[in-house]
Amino acid sequence: MRISIVGITGYSGMELLRILLQHPQVEVVSLHASQDREAPVSELYPHLKGICDLKIEAFDSQEIMRRADLVFFATSSGVAKDLSKDFVEVGFPVIDLSGDHRLPGNIYKKWYQKEPAEDHVQKKFIYGLSEFADVRGERFIANPGCYATATELALIPLLQAQAIELDSIIVDAKSGLTGAGKNPAASSHFVHVHDNYVTYKLNQHQHIPEIVQQLQRFDESLQQIQFSTSLIPLNRGIVATVYSKLKEPLTQEELTAIYQECYQEKPFVRIQATLPSLHQVVGTNYTDIGFDYNHVTNILTVVAVLDNLIKGAAGQAVQNMNLMLGFPETDGLLSQPSYV
């Protein structure tokens, strides 16, 4: 399977290349980005010298379709919706890591403050939360966001079990700095974020409608969630701490059974007996989930952790590719965490 990557110079694009270079069933044939000159990727990123020396090329949809069998878009929001149209029109497989095809046009425009993809194009994309989406044989996948992935994986088992009060859901999500993207900004400047803790986009984060839309698939009576996001001075990682009230008290054993039944055949979700930490998952495609119930307050706390560049982006995109093409789901994705 021949692969092209558009948006190679961003953090997710580089992580996607790293994973695909180790994949047993694919060959990366072209890399694309918006830059003034073509240059070997190893010239711009010396850690790739002798590993990948492909040139970074200007985007050309016809050339990509001539050389590749599938294209990944690891571009900023607002880019893939336009560049992917040529591929969609002829049925050429696309996996989009950005938010451009996750939401209906009117909702996308409100939350992203950008013009949406054309309606007939957006409707062809299936939302690829790998543990719950049936993407086998599909051609167009909208990869979930990093916050959305952690939050949805934490909550879906509880919705399926009808265990929680829907109007009590509060999510406190924290991200490492790569989640803010590569473009320099005052909000991610070293002096601003080092030795600091910054809450941002309170009640305004673009993953809110994505999360609500997907949770409603499991309980359509859910109306809204309370969702906050913060940056923490780490390179990688998402920690989603999810609070909700139970309809009826449950023991730790009963809660564990709910989660294990949901994820028993899902290789990249691990239910932990203790609350998880980021070191357990950084550098991997795993999501680790732990929980604790307070019988005094009737509040269940669920903690989900993942690597925002892997399970929250490039790793899940490859997981979706594997499922789409009928490859073993774990191909290219069985890296182990580096604990320290």
Curated annotation (Swiss-Prot):
Catalytic reaction annotation: N-acetyl-L-glutamate 5-semialdehyde + phosphate + NADP(+) = N-acetyl-L-glutamyl 5-phosphate + NADPH + H(+)
Catalytic center residues: C146
EC number: 1.2.1.38
Gene3D superfamilies: Dihydrodipicolinate Reductase, domain 2, NAD(P)-binding Rossmann-like Domain
PROSITE patterns per UniProt: ARGC
GO cellular component, one term: cytoplasm
Keyword Oxidoreductase recorded: yes
Annotated GO MF terms: N-acetyl-gamma-glutamyl-phosphate reductase activity; NAD binding; NADP+ binding
Function of the protein: Catalyzes the NADPH-dependent reduction of N-acetyl-5-glutamyl phosphate to yield N-acetyl-L-glutamate 5-semialdehyde.
Protein name: N-acetyl-gamma-glutamyl-phosphate reductase
Species in which this protein is naturally found: Streptococcus gordonii (strain Challis / ATCC 35105 / BCRC 15272 / CH1 / DL1 / V288)
